[in-house]
Regions:
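Cysteine-dependent PTP/DSP-like catalytic domain, specifically the C-terminal lobe
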Residues: 381-398
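Short helix-start
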Residues: 10, 20-25, 29, 48-86
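Short hydrophobic transmembrane-like helices used for membrane targeting/insertion
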Residues: 6-8, 42, 46, 390
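A detector of low-complexity, intrinsically disordered, Ser/Thr/Gly/Pro/Ala-rich segments
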Residues: 2, 33-36, 51
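Core catalytic lobe of class I
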Residues: 30-32, 36, 40-44, 64, ...
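A detector for short, charged/polar N-terminal pre-domain segments
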Residues: 2-23, 89-100
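The DNA-recognition helices of helix-turn-helix-type DNA-binding domains
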Residues: 49-52, 359, 369, 390-393
Length: 398
């Protein structure tokens, strides 16, 4: 749905849960996903098998457990969410052909529901930052936690965490048993700032170049007061919150890779060191996924092979130069980052998904490595840019 830009004010609402008026039955697996427990532990608490259905009293018992943890629905809304899911009509599914070497324009949270099971060997993406950029063609989604906003423009950092985890929940059924998810996400600080159109605009402003704008001249501003615990200027720890909750969804957290950038955006250093890292969360749906560590040594560095300055082993520390961010999208996602993720986790001919395709970097890497791909992006503008970049990469192979 269309989105009217609004300021980001990270207030924490006071919940007033209503526990009466629910009479549905809910699959145990669905309840496990929103209570942060394994299906076997849920069964142990309520005294039922994993194939059983649960009622409202069972859910209330689970919400009273010390083991309860929020995943992507706040505690006060869980019964409402489960009721809505049980009444939800089935959606038409896409075919494998519909998903092969295709760019799909739409919301990832909607498109993922329509995709076939177990088709992707690798899912790799770089998500938006929380409340730091305005993208083209932004559309609002209505999320499981009740918030209506574009992904990345939530009112609180935990809203962004919940929405990230909701997308991971919806993506899980599409991943093959030995497949991998590589989820690149950057952290941010709970600070009063402007939400700009791109990184170049931010850099020009820091250098005093371009049009000078005051605080009130920006279309969207981010405030820092009103949160239940985050103080002004405090790091939000978003990648680690997503990682913890992904484990509660049933993913295996295989590693949290530190992407060290050889150069990064300048930042004020009045009270802290400058950031030069992001994180790549490696998730799987079984204990032992496919892993081709030889790719690190054999592949060219431009596609994800070892850089001259990197260690002689494939570790959880990757030192890669960020992209210059040219073009309409302006992301810092370099070709060798998705290239490495794809190369170590898949084989030629396998299918790769990027649910936030942007300018098409993941598909370009997949194409050059002989993999097939699916891209999703909510922006028709970025989808066209991605298709141009992918077409150029494909033509260069012949």
């Amino acid at each position: 749905m269309p989105w009217t830009p609004v300021d980001v004010k990270p207030y924490t609402p006071v919940a007033q849960p209503v526990w009466s008026g629910h009479d549905g039955v809910y699959p145990l697996e669905a309840v496990a996903a929103v209570t942060g427990m394994t299906p076997s532990f849920v069964g142990k608490v309520v005294g039922k098998s994993k194939s059983a259905t649960l009622g409202p009293d069972d859910v209330r018992l689970l919400l009273e457990q010390d083991a309860y943890h929020e995943t992507f629905v706040p505690r006060s809304r869980i019964l409402d969410y489960l009721e809505a899911q049980s009444d939800r009509p089935k959606v038409k599914s896409l075919s494998l052909e519909d998903c092969t070497d295709r760019m799909i324009v739409g919301s990832s949270r909607d498109v993922l529901d329509t995709m076939p099971n177990s088709i992707y060997q690798t899912i790799v993406t770089s998500t938006p930052y929380w409340a730091m950029r305005l993208y083209k063609d932004m559309e609002a989604d209505t999320w499981a936690d009740g918030e209506t906003c574009p992904y990345g423009m939530e009112q609180t950092p935990e809203g962004f965490v919940r929405h990230s985890v909701e997308i991971l929940h919806k993506a899980k059924h599409t991943l093959k048993g030995d497949g991998s998810v590589f989820w690149n996400v950057g952290d941010t600080y709970n600070t009063r700032t402007q939400v700009r159109n791109n990184a170049a605009e931010t850099l020009r402003a820091m250098h005093g170049e371009g049009e000078r704008k005051g605080w009130h001249d920006h279309a969207v501003r981010r405030y820092s007061s009103g949160h239940s615990y985050l103080k002004d200027g405090e790091q939000c720890l978003i990648p680690f919150e997503i990682t913890r909750r992904a484990s509660m969804l049933g993913y295996w957290v295989k590693s949290v890779i530190c992407w060290g950038k050889t150069h990064s955006m300048p930042e004020p250093q009045t009270s802290r060191v400058s950031r030069a890292t992001e994180h790549i969360i490696h998730l799987t749906v079984q204990r032992t996924p496919t892993l081709h560590k030889e790719f690190y040594f054999d592949a060219p560095s431009e596609l994800g092979g070892k850089e001259d300055w990197e260690a002689d082993k494939l570790s959880d520390s990757w030192l890669l130069s960020p992209s210059a961010g040219r073009g309409g999208h302006g992301a810092q996602f370099p070709l060798n980052l998705p290239g490495r993720c794809i190369g170590i986790s898949s084989e030629r001919g396998d299918l790769v998904l990027d649910p936030f395709m942007g300018s098409g970097t993941t598909a370009v890497a997949a194409t050059r490595l002989g993999r097939r791909w699916t891209g999703i992006d909510i922006s028709p503008t970025y989808a066209k840019e991605a298709e141009r970049n992918i077409r150029t990469a494909s033509e260069a192979l012949f």
